[in-house]
């Protein structure tokens, strides 16, 4: 949605007689369609090559799928809220998820990676990372991020001004 705003073509979408939630949903589905296959396949293959069985492969694929959907929902929201959202998204992944979240427990509470890693470790009966979250909490947070980001995306899209 960010590119449609920047190049001023979103006005054409607005005047199409469809429900306002459909455009953000289509953006989320489009980004998930592009992102999920390589993420899930590569994580599944890595689990198969380095893992110890079917449980690890299934848990890895399920966790990668949940995390990818959460990231797609969050980054679709960034596309509506910010200009140059790709740079902000890369900054979030590289700086926040890669460096800051690993440095402290408070910052880790705002990291999708920490919740997905915690869920994966619980599903495989491995030592959970620090800080640890229960499997239920990790599932709820990943689902909550996905749902909240999508809901905010729909609300923001409804309130955008036609330019």
Predicted regions and their residues:
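Transmembrane helix boundary and interhelical loop/hinge segments in multi-pass membrane proteins
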Residues: 1-14
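Secretory targeting signals
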Residues: 2-3, 24-92, 101, 128-141
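Alpha-helix N-cap/start motif
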Residues: 20-21
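Terminal transmembrane helical anchor/hairpin motif
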Residues: 81, 86-156
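Short cytosolic juxtamembrane segments of multi-pass membrane proteins
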Residues: 158-163
């Amino acid at each position: 949605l960010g590119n449609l705003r920047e190049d001023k073509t979103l006005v054409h979408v607005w005047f199409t007689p469809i429900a306002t939630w459909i455009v953000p949903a289509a953006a989320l589905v489009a980004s998930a369609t592009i992102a999920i296959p390589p993420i899930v396949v590569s994580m599944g293959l890595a689990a198969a090559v380095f893992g110890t069985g079917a449980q690890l492969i299934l848990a890895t694929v399920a966790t990668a799928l949940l995390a990818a959907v959460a990231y797609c929902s969050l980054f679709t929201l960034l596309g509506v809220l910010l200009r140059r959202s790709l740079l902000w998204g890369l900054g979030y992944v590289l700086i926040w998820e890669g460096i800051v979240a690993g440095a402290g427990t408070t910052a880790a509470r705002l990291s999708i990676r920490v919740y997905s890693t915690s869920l994966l470790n619980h599903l495989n009966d491995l030592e959970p990372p620090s800080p640890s979250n229960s499997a239920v909490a990790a599932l709820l947070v990943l689902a909550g991020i996905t749902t909240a980001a999508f809901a905010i995306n729909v609300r923001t899209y409804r309130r955008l001004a036609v330019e």
